[in-house]
Amino acid sequence: MGYLQSQKAVSLGDENTDALFKLHTSNRKSANMFGIKSELLNPSELSAVGSYSNDICPNRQSSSSTAADTSPSTNASNTNISFPEQEHKDELFMNVEPKGVGSSMDNHAITIHHSTGNGLLRSSFDHDYRQKNSPRNSIHRLSNISIGNNPIDFESSQQNNPSSLNTSSHHRTSSISNSKSFGTSLSYYNRSSKPSDWNQQNNGGHLSGVISITQDVSSVPLQSSVFSSGNHAYHASMAPKRSGSWRHTNFHSTSHPRAASIGNKSGIPPVPTIPPNIGHSTDHQHPKANISGSLTKSSSESKNLSTIQSPLKTSNSFFKELSPHSQITLSNVKNNHSHVGSQTKSHSFATPSVFDNNKPVSSDNHNNTTTSSQVHPDSRNPDPKAAPKAVSQKTNVDGHRNHEAKHGNTVQNESKSQKSSNKEGRSSRGGFFSRLSFSRSSSRMKKGSKAKHEDAPDVPAIPHAYIADSSTKSSYRNGKKTPTRTKSRMQQFINWFKPSKERSSNGNSDSASPPPVPRLSITRSQVSREPEKPEEIPSVPPLPSNFKDKGHVPQQRSVSYTPKRSSDTSESLQPSLSFASSNVLSEPFDRKVADLAMKAINSKRINKLLDDAKVMQSLLDRACIITPVRNTEVQLINTAPLTEYEQDEINNYDNIYFTGLRNVDKRRSADENTSSNFGFDDERGDYKVVLGDHIAYRYEVVDFLGKGSFGQVLRCIDYETGKLVALKIIRNKKRFHMQALVETKILQKIREWDPLDEYCMVQYTDHFYFRDHLCVATELLGKNLYELIKSNGFKGLPIVVIKSITRQLIQCLTLLNEKHVIHCDLKPENILLCHPFKSQVKVIDFGSSCFEGECVYTYIQSRFYRSPEVILGMGYGTPIDVWSLGCIIAEMYTGFPLFPGENEQEQLACIMEIFGPPDHSLIDKCSRKKVFFDSSGKPRPFVSSKGVSRRPFSKSLHQVLQCKDVSFLSFISDCLKWDPDERMTPQQAAQHDFLTGKQDVRRPNTAPARQKFARPPNIETAPIPRPLPNLPMEYNDHTLPSPKEPSNQASNLVRSSDKFPNLLTNLDYSIISDNGFLRKPVEKSRP
């Protein structure tokens, strides 16, 4: 049987599926959107279907369903509203009432309101889409649907209940759109008029143009409806913004009337389901004639019908009984979880993944079914934003349908549908999730499915060449993909080291390479899951021919066995005398370890270093290059004004960069006369420096760095180069002036000899005269070595730092020795660090330097580091710097000077205390021998101011240093030889064991002088004692001590063997130390 008869039947086959999808998503604001004109809606032809009214808005005195929301005792029914029949073009009212099956179904009435006078037909899906995307997004954009279950038809209800306009506790009305259990429902949207009072509309009135389905709760208890999952249908104040979420309801669920027998907790029905044919396509249009003809015929055939009843057996039979037009205007009756295969046969469509979570849909006779009216609009103005989304949804649905149909998961899907129906049954009995009409876990599945299917890009087709070509490493065989196993990281790592031929043999390189596979757009999640692709490691180059000489041992693959190397290898590798070629591999490693040790040392004074770093950073920010101006345009510089002397002085300078800070007082307190250099010098001849003042109208004085006998050193900003420099201002004395000229000459030579700055010497910048003072500008460095030792608490430096600094100092001395330059003032104060956290150093202060053969001064070097030939008045050369180097290394190790003499007499006594007096040959060459020795060559006794008397050979070097490193002790002793000709040169020092890392197998005797020692070794195998400084000849005349007493002079003991022939033979436990001490002479006991 048909509810609405039509002149032409339109089937719901697959050919009209896309058309139904597009017609529901078309623009609803077109004037002829649905192809229905005003003249087609003839009241005479549609009078049998329903009643008409000229009022767009219903009577405000009629009670609404929202009244029941606010008060449990007040209800209303929209079925009993009487409409005047003067205006028939404004409303279309149809009553359709399908019958239920068995005892679980009852008579239901469908009341549909349509209007074309002031508004347009619209669907709940359109409302949902427009509400999401419209900028207005107000409460006026509502989909007004009233759905309910009422066993009493409209006219009978109007006749039997004359007071139906009053409140009733048995009639309820609900307005639900975009629900889950229903298909797309039609609603009336009035464009010309809006509710003046929305709260009043919700509480006391009913909106015009709604589908009203009512239910009498008292008469139909414990029965499920075809159109709702519960026994009650309530009015929702507005449509949900998104499926499953209720917003702006303006009522509380606790105020709804409860049915105790049903167990409905909240009273709000579940949200109906959006039909599957929504949001898939927007390109198809439905003919206008089908809709108009269907409406005309259906209205004529059902003219005198007030209620149409039919038993509803199955979902397929329901569609067969409906008229063709009802198949178009009413949505397909389907279950929320019907199978895809059976759904295709029954002309129903799969729900998109956005709404239905991509669950297979199966037809079930026992499940609840829903019916909603649908009218497919004309898509004259398609929404461009909705089109891509709809197409992608259709693609996902089709792919899901094909996948399910291919694998045939019918039994599994039916079991899922039964579980889902049971969950819906539970949700229909009440609870919070009963309002949303899905199970508690469906929202999570829905979100996961939406993120999985909606945002996934389209997978491009694989080129045929990859499938057909069998030479490639493709996992496709005969057009079918075979399961492959991804190689592990270890396998990939092993393949890196395979030869290139073996890797290339895996694939046929002769065959033509297939075309590249088009790549997909990679997302962030895909990148995180992709394994790292290792780069190709080049093959190991072959060994050079010189490595394949005699004695070379081939490399072994196993690390568990290391063959013993041949001794011929050391013989073939002869050490070179060049310092640059020695120890090239160990030096970078030692430098890094030394830098770590420097960080540990300076970490104790990190606060001061941070303050210094802030000051340095502020200076670096101020340092910049300034464009100079002429001396006549000095007023253009925003600096300090010129004094009267400067106004006359500035004429001697062509380029003016800086004249001083504006808040600096540049006036000198002394009288401006010629004796004091117009007040710019003090009585010592040093320049009176004012911080913030200029030097030569180019440098800005920042602070003081140091002051010495030659003058003073300032830290300045050079505005010509934009760098920080150290400016040395020499005293205004002729002696120092001449020496400063020599220094400037040597610095210029060093810049020529070392253009790449590789020999650890300060870099010269410029020199000039300013107010009768010679100024020398060099690069700015850090603190000196003495301050480093002081910051470490005079505890000495680590041996790795000492080795690193020693190597750099020897590198400097090597260049000076090759160029025959004597530094003449090598000390810790003249060795500066380049960085506080690094061991890189540079040698400064060449003010006392000279060339060999051009020695001017005899009193040179600092006392603690002064060589013996300088003290004794002998001729000196480059070996004096090697002596100073030995003293500096010893001080870096102990933290104190090795020879701390108060004057030259005590300084020489400190040297003889460890190494003894010098040889007579050296004393004869001394011009000052009478100061330190008597006529017989004996050292004159000397007592210091502290009452300390030092005796020769009273201490050993290892006692003073408290060191057991043989190479280190040997290195210092070779630097501290009496004879300069026997002293170690810088080239020899570069090849010493201490710097090259070769350790001597001979262990020194580190026991003190008065300590027990073991039995002496055999004389034949005893090592040769290290040579000592030559002793003066006058010591032969001294009387020897008694044999029973310890002797302090081993050489005298050996020379007096004629007088005491049995002395050495009677000693059983005796050994000669490094400095010639007899440890414990003991007479041999007689039997």
From Swiss-Prot:
GO cellular component, one term: cell division site
Basic residues compositional bias, start-end: 478-488
Phosphoserine modified-residue sites: S513
Enzyme Commission number(s): 2.7.12.1
Membrane topology: Peripheral membrane protein
Enzyme class: transferase
Basic and acidic residues composition bias: residue spans: 397-407, 527-536
Compositional bias segments (type: Polar residues): 132-165, 246-256, 336-361, 555-578, 1045-1055
Function: Polarity factor involved in localization of polarized growth and cytokinesis. Forms an intracellular gradient that serves to measure cell length and control mitotic entry. Controls the timing of mitotic commitment by regulating the inhibitory impact of cdr1/cdr2 on wee1 activity. Directly phosphorylates the tail of cdr2 which inhibits cdr2 activation by ssp1. Cdr2 phosphorylation by pom1 also modulates cdr2 association with membranes and inhibits cdr2 interaction with mid1, reducing its clustering ability, possibly via the down-regulation of cdr2 kinase activity.
Oligomeric and partner information: Interacts with rga4. Interacts with tea4; this interaction triggers pom1 plasma membrane association.
Name listed for the protein in its UniProt record: DYRK-family kinase pom1
Source organism of the structure: Schizosaccharomyces pombe (strain 972 / ATCC 24843) (Fission yeast)
Gene name per UniProt: pom1
